[in-house]
Regions:
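Active-site beta3 strand of CheY-like receiver
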Residues: 50-55, 60
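Acidic catalytic/metal-coordinating carboxylates
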Residues: 37-38, 64-67
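Charged docking surfaces used in two-component/phosphorelay signaling
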Residues: 20-28
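Alpha4 helix (beta4-alpha4-beta5 surface) of REC/receiver domains from two-component response regulators
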Residues: 67, 88-103, 116
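The feature encodes the CheY-like receiver
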Residues: 19, 61, 89
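Short amphipathic alpha-helix used as the core "switch/output" element in two-component signaling
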Residues: 44, 66-77
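C-terminal output helix
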Residues: 109-118
C-alpha cells in the first residue's frame, strides 16, 4: 500500500478561502495537494502531473466544474473525481453523474466526509492497480 504522502489530490475552487481550507485538511492528513482557482489552471497542472483524486467546485469562472470533468474524462477515465458545490438539484446531480463524477458533496462538507472520500478513492485505485500502470 502506498503511503498517504505519496498520494496527490487536486482541489479546484475559485474561492481562495475554500482552497486554503481544503489544502490544509488534506495536507494535515498527509496528502500532497495541488490547487487551482479555475478549470484552465487545473488542466495545465494535469498536463504535467498525474493526479488520480480530484475535488472540483461546480461553479467556476469560465469553464464550469461539470465541463472540466468532461475534459478530464476525455483524456483519462481512471481518476476519481468528486464534485463540491454550494448548490444541489436533482438535475445537477444527474449532470454530475453523466460527466463522470464519483459523488457530489454539498457545502459545507464535514471534514470527516472529505477525508473518508479521499481514503476510499485511494483504496479503490490500489485495488485497480494493474501491471505497468501506476495509478497512484
Amino acid at each position: 500500500m502506498v503511503a498517504a504522502g505519496d498520494k496527490k489530490i487536486l482541489v479546484v475552487d475559485d474561492e481562495v478561502s475554500v482552497l486554503a481550507l481544503l489544502k490544509e485538511i488534506f495536507s494535515t492528513a498527509g496528502y500532497k495537494v495541488r490547487t487551482a482557482r479555475n478549470a484552465e489552471e487545473a488542466l495545465k497542472i494535469l498536463q504535467t502531473e498525474t493526479i488520480m483524486v480530484m475535488f472540483l467546485d461546480l461553479r467556476l469562472p469560465g469553464m464550469n466544474g461539470i465541463d472540466l470533468c468532461w475534459k478530464i474524462r476525455e483524456k483519462d477515465k481512471i481518476p476519481i473525481v468528486y464534485a463540491v458545490t454550494g448548490y444541489s438539484t436533482l438535475y445537477g446531480i444527474l449532470e454530475c453523474r453523466a460527466a463522470g463524477f464519483e459523488d457530489v458533496f454539498v457545502k459545507p462538507v464535514p471534514t470527516t466526509l472529505l477525508l473518508k472520500a479521499a481514503k476510499d478513492a485511494f483504496e479503490k485505485l490500489g485495488r485497480w492497480k494493474v501491471r505497468d500502470y501506476d495509478l497512484i
